[in-house]
Amino acid sequence: MEAEKWRYYLQPYINTSRHEGFYERDYTDQLDRFLSQKYTRAEKWIRTREFNRAQSNLEEIKSLDPNYKEVQSLLEFSQVEPIYVQALDLLEGNKFREVHDLLQPMLKKYPNQEVLRKLEEQAIERGKYRLGIISDPNIEGSEATMSAALQSAVISLIQKNNDPFLELLDRTNFEMLQQEQEAIINGTTNEAAVTKELLAADAYLKIVMTHVNENEGTLNKQTRRGWERYYVTTKSNEGEQVKKAQYKKVTYKEYTKQNEASYDMQLAMVERSTSRILWSISFHHEDKDEIHYVEFSGTGDLFSGNWRYQNKEHPSDHRKNDSRSMNRLVKANKRIQSTSSMRKDAISALAQKAAAHVNQQKLTKE
């Protein structure tokens, strides 16, 4: 850059021991003339709205003398003004969300820029989309119970997204929503229920559980016959002690259980003024858990199999070589996820899907 070249050219002469004052004054005079020329050009380019060229000059001036005249104010203006003009054009075209997104980097850089802040507020106010959350008054039972819980979860997740353009109607207005629900479901609008236009929603988000199926299984128990391995110590022909495996006939209990659940949710957005369905989407969630374990009172390794008589041999007696798998069943988990726990998981998962879908719409009033 020209300013840097000028700085490096003059720097060797600043601190010389001979005629130090002369060179210092000369450097200062030259720098003042240089900065004055740059500043005058920057003012000219701002008047002719050549903001990029003005910024380049002002940044050079600031690097040499941050306190030179009004360099900081002019630099801020040269950066803010083109963004402000562009945002005004977008605002006139009702591109409210684009206005907001365009202003954010500059507002972060200059948080006290009141002109930009007011423009942002105007865009948010004009583009704010008011959304009411409703359910189907005709559903009942577990579907109605889950729908209410799901609505609450969706509201919470949407609010956490902090979208400045999306406003959920306050719970104090839900009585008005309920008065309109039946009319909305039937394809009409109940204008008498709208006491204040400012409280009316632009659209309603209908959240309904259309299908709930929860199957809490029974704990199946079967008494089975098997073999327990134990060891006895004997002496070999050489007189050494040797452990020898023996098997005895035992019984054990085998348990199995399976819980499963499936849920279907419908999410639809209905325009308040016309009752027209703007979009509708369905989500499915299912879950399953099962347990399989063995209870055995012995201390040795367990083998499955079968036998006729416990106290005497029979040709039909047989023993499987499956102690590893049987021991795993002895140590297996005995706790199973309940369907009520599955329901909570389903509400959480479906609410996240619903809230994500709503947030992706980038709802803005046109």
What spans do the regions from the language model cover?
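Short secondary-structure boundary motifs at beta->alpha junctions and helix caps
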Residues: 228, 237-264, 272-350
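Short coil/turn motifs at beta-sheet boundaries
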Residues: 124-126, 198-200, 254-260
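N-terminal segment of the mature soluble domain
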Residues: 133-135, 141-220, 239, 262-264, ...
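Internal, charge-rich low-complexity segments
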Residues: 181-187, 210-234, 288-308
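A structural "domain/chain start" motif
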Residues: 8, 16-25, 39-50, 56-60, ...
